[in-house]
Swiss-Prot record:
The lineage of its organism: Bacteria, Pseudomonadati, Pseudomonadota, Betaproteobacteria, Burkholderiales. Binds 1 zinc ion per subunit. Zn(2+) binds at C338, H389, H515. Residues 1-66 form the TGS domain. This is Threonine--tRNA ligase. Pfam families: HGTP_anticodon, TGS, tRNA-synt_2b, tRNA_SAD. Belongs to the class-II aminoacyl-tRNA synthetase family. It catalyses: tRNA(Thr) + L-threonine + ATP = L-threonyl-tRNA(Thr) + AMP + diphosphate + H(+). The keyword Transcription does not apply. It comes from the Bacteria. Homodimer. It comes from Bordetella avium (strain 197N).
Length: 650
């Protein structure tokens, strides 16, 4: 007798071993049809994701996985990657298959083939995939010995697959999945039949080196996406279109903010308007430092290699570091700011009464990222971090983390991000420090989030070897997630670099160090800002807050006068005194995403008014100039993120 416990706590008895599919069928035909896999738990072990054909031969807990579950969607995508390989082999028998994992929102599969695939090939492959899916062929799992599997794949000319299998220990069973005439290596699980794969689309072609090594053959990578429903896929494709429209690289060029060029790969050439935007972000964060007990510091750009060896960076990060030599000494260009802050802490002896001690820096860092990974401002080689480090005692951890989270939430709101996801990464197997210290640190992080009303996920084992951390992920205007801020507990670096304070018993102790950043890379954050706002920066951030346009030459003097008045009050304003038609001026400045366009003619000059237009179709008509000044002051003071038709709106 086998007893199956379902997620609602109900139990079902079966006379003998039973498959996941049979359990689903016994519950109802609807569930049986929707079942993609099962999540089985035996004897309180970790749940195991299995095929619907998996036979349960002892008492267990079982959850039926359908397309509505996150695991179900991953299963669909993984199985669609295999369907892609099946279709490619059907159309191009000489192609060799390699690997095909699930990635965010889809999957890819790498192939070796004698000629490059074309967009027309992609269309043919997708059509073949749909044909194979309609055949609804059963997907079956088979277990082979390693040597038999290697021999088989060599015999059919699949040398890459044979190489992968040969690297698996000889005593391990190899699982293969067969659908129709196609068989592939995979741990599984997979959908029960190809007919479960109804909604998919091939997206693009790219190159990828075998095993990520540039000395190996360049393979052809086909990317695809797959979804449970057509509505979900349509929403995703619409999001991609919107993301392309908002691409910060295009907007940066169109709005004359910055550019990139081959002579400085991964580095940014800031234009005047772009640098003005940068300065607004930096000045805002500088005020955040000042108002929240941080002391701003500045550490050197390059430091002797001996220091990077002490911190462990040279052993673990040297491939990403730039180095230089002078007078027979080797220096490392800093990839991060923390070692410099410890040196500043170590420059004097600190009492426990001085803690927590908070340092902040707009630290310029350089990392030798692979050229293929560079992506506009989102992945660069030179960047500036709003980096901060807090030196505190173990007892101060929770308060510091709670205060930081509350501060971070306010900063994100001011920049227009209202949805934040929270994740706590806990102790890995390899770590330093006692379990007691880890317990205390992890509890402090979780309690700090609870105190600030945050729901959070736990990522077991994803903390660094030197301490747990909280990751803060932003959700932007089109639903994308951006991992941004972090606060990381560090038990290691203070000890490695000899940081000490004197406790209440006159004993020297190593402080706990908290690495924290709110924006992270300012370059990346500004790229996110541009895309979140589609280039239409709110008035408090906009490089140009208003443009004053004269309708004709007689009103040019008044336009120049009020422009000067606004500039003297600290606003970023330009005058457009050209002899162009006013409709052309308005259109040009609207395309430049200027928050306010002030139109003035003879009537406005006589009455001391301005006709106010703005983003989003705003048209206030003619209002007193002083009223506009008050409105703009309110926009800046409140950091209002949308130009509102009603000046009283927030």
């Amino acid at each position: 007798m086998v007893q199956i416990t379902l997620p609602d706590g109900s139990q079902r008895q079966y006379p003998g071993p039973v498959t996941v599919a049979e359990v689903a069928q016994s519950i109802g035909t609807g569930l049986a049809k929707a079942a993609l896999a099962g999540r089985v738990t035996v004897n309180d072990a970790e749940p195991k994701l299995v095929d619907t054909s998996f036979r349960i031969d002892q008492d267990a807990k079982l959850a039926i996985v359908t397309a509505k579950d996150a695991d179900g969607l991953d299963l669909i995508r993984h199985s669609t990657a295999h369907l892609l390989a099946y279709a490619v082999k059907s159309l191009y028998p000489d192609a060799q298959v390699t690997i095909g994992p699930v990635i965010d929102n889809g999957f890819y599969y790498d192939f070796s083939y004698k000629r490059p695939f074309t967009p027309e090939d992609l269309q043919a492959i997708e059509k073949k995939m749909a044909e194979l899916a309609r055949k609804d062929e059963v997907v079956t799992r088979e277990e082979w010995t390693r040597d038999d599997a290697v021999a088989y794949f060599k015999s059919i000319g699949e040398n890459y697959k044979a190489e992968i299998i040969a690297s698996i220990p000889s005593n391990e069973k190899i699982s293969l999945y067969r659908e129709g005439e196609f068989i592939d290596l995979c741990r599984g699980p997979h959908v029960p039949s190809t007919g479960k794969l109804k909604v998919f689309k091939l997206m693009k072609l790219a190159g990828a080196y075998w095993r990520g090594d540039s000395n190996n053959e360049m393979l052809q990578r086909i990317y695809g996406t797959a979804w449970a429903t057509k509505d979900e896929q349509d929403a995703y494709l619409h999001m991609l279109e919107e993301a392309e429209r908002r691409d910060h690289r295009k907007i940066g060029r169109d709005l004359d903010l910055f550019h990139f060029q081959d002579e400085g790969p991964g580095l940014i050439f800031w234009h005047p308007k772009g640098w003005t935007l940068w300065q607004q972000v930096e000045q805002y964060m500088r005020a955040v430092y000042r108002d929240n007990g941080y002391q701003e510091v500045k550490a050197p750009q390059i430091l002797d290699l001996s220091l990077w060896k002490k911190t462990g960076h040279w052993d673990n990060y040297r491939e990403n570091m730039f180095t230089t030599e002078s007078e027979n000494r080797v220096y490392g260009l800093k990839p991060m700011n923390c070692p410099g802050h410890v040196q500043i802490f170590n420059a004097g002896l600190h009492s426990y009464r001085e803690l927590p001690l908070r340092y902040g820096e707009f630290g310029q860092c350089h990392r030798n990222e692979p050229s293929g990974s560079l992506h506009g401002m989102m992945r660069v080689r030179g960047f500036t971090q709003d980096d901060g480090h807090i030196f505190c005692t173990e007892d101060q951890l929770q308060d510091e983390c709670a205060d930081f989270t509350a501060l971070l939430q306010k900063v994100y709101r001011d920049f227009g991000f209202t949805e934040v996801l929270y994740k706590v990464a806990t102790r890995p197997e390899k770590r330093i420090g006692s379990d007691e210290i880890w317990d205390k640190a992890e509890t402090a992080l979780m309690e700090s989030l609870r105190r600030t009303g945050c729901e959070f996920e736990i990522s077991p084992g994803e903390g660094a070897f030197y301490g747990p951390k909280i990751e803060y992920t932003l959700k932007d205007a089109i639903g994308r997630h951006w991992q941004c801020g972090t606060i990381q507990v560090d038990f290691s670096m203070p000890v490695r670099l000899g940081a000490e304070y004197v406790d209440q018993n006159d004993q020297r102790r190593a402080p706990v160090m908290l690495h924290r950043a709110i924006l992270g890379s300012l370059e990346r954050f500004i790229g996110m800002l541009i895309e979140n706002h589609a280039g239409a920066m709110p008035p408090w951030l906009a490089p140009v807050q208003a443009v004053v346009c004269c309708i004709s030459e007689p009103s040019a003097e008044y336009a120049a006068k009020i422009t000067q008045s606004l500039k003297k009050q600290g606003f970023r304003v330009q005058a457009d005194l050209r002899g162009e038609k006013i409709t052309r001026k308005i259109r040009e400045h609207s395309l430049q995403k200027v928050p306010y366009i002030l139109v003035v003619g003879d009537k406005e000059a006589q009455n001391g008014t301005v006709a106010v237009r703005g983003l989003g179709g705003l048209d206030l008509g003619a209002i007193p100039f002083d009223d506009f000044v008050a409105r703009l002051n309110e926009d800046v003071a409140s950091r209002r993120n949308v130009v509102q038709p009603d000046s009283k709106a927030v």
